[in-house]
Amino acid sequence: MPFLWGLRQDKEACVGTNNQSYICDTGHCCGQSQCCNYYYELWWFWLVWTVVIILSCCCVCHHRRAKHRLQAQQRQHEINLIAYREAHNYSALPFYFRFLPNSLLPPYEEVVNRPPTPPPPYSAFQLQQQQQLLPPPPQGGPPGGSPPGADPPPQGSQGAQSSPLSGPSRSSTRPPSVADPQSPEVPTDREATKASGTESGSPMAGHGELDPGAFLDQDSECKEELLKDSRSERGGVSPDSEDKTPGRHRRFTGDSGIEVCVCNRGHHDDDLKEFNTLIDDALDGPLDFCDSCHVRPPVDEEEGLCLSSEGQAREHGHPHLPRPPACLLLNTINEQDSPNSQHSGSPS
């Protein structure tokens, strides 16, 4: 720098008046006997300029910050003023909103703790379906009873009515992905069996009493129907459903397992013996038998609707008449199709 450069200069010898020489320690020779220095050679000159520059930068920064702060305050003041004017001028709803509150939803705070109506029970939809499927009462008589000269309705027909009602309602509760496919011959066989059960129940009701021989006939019909159903399923369904056997009752236990029992009606004929051997060969071991097909197991998800239909039949019928055995066809579920089999590796 210039002032350091001046400090590094050697002493300069000057010639004064009368040819007298003198030496300048700093600066240069000027005049007769003086030593002078330039302004950029002075140290305080550069110090002053440095301080001036620093102060100028500080002033500029402070001015810009104050300007930005003032602009922000002005914008906030304008926003507050606009909001105050809007709230003051439009305290009521606008004209095009005054006719809408009746059609708008209520606020959330008004209905969060005060529902207007409780949810309908789960059995309401099932009862409505059953009422739609029931035949209408006769026009001449009262809706709740029968004409004075007519015979009481047979209990067998009521059982035949309750069993087809429980079938669609139970199948409606099951998801379509879990339902197993069936051959087209099965529904026709079931309809024929139901029609024969209804026809056989009407003459028994005409005599006024039910004989035990009719019960045995219906038991044999149920067994034949179950065997026919199993044969048709084995002939027309995919190989995945070949393990289905007639009379098997499956119930999900809730712990990813299925309890299986065989309908044991107390008759040991050739069909049941052959049926037992088939089950032992298919399942590699003996299988538990149910106590009775007429004793209902604990109600599960698939058979929960049967109780409501039977209760209605008891209300409309006569309790003193014995109830004929109703042939219930249970739609079993393949272990491969059930969602629990994907997580559990052990066979059911």
Swiss-Prot record:
Keyword Protease: no
Predominant cellular place of this UniProt entry's protein: membrane
Biased composition (Low complexity): 156-177
Biased composition, class Basic and acidic residues, residue ranges: 220-234
Entry keywords, A to Z: Membrane, Phosphoprotein, Transmembrane, Transmembrane helix
Location of region: Disordered: 111-253, 306-348
Biased composition (Polar residues): 331-348
Gene Ontology molecular function terms on file: ubiquitin protein ligase binding
Residue stretches spanning the membrane: 42-62
Gene Ontology process terms (BP): CXCL12-activated CXCR4 signaling pathway; hemopoiesis; positive regulation of protein ubiquitination
Topology of the protein relative to the lipid bilayer: Single-pass membrane protein
InterPro entries xref list: WBP1-like (IPR021684), WW_domain-binding (IPR051994)
Positions with biased composition (Pro residues): 134-155
The protein, known as: WW domain binding protein 1-like
Source species: Mus musculus (Mouse)
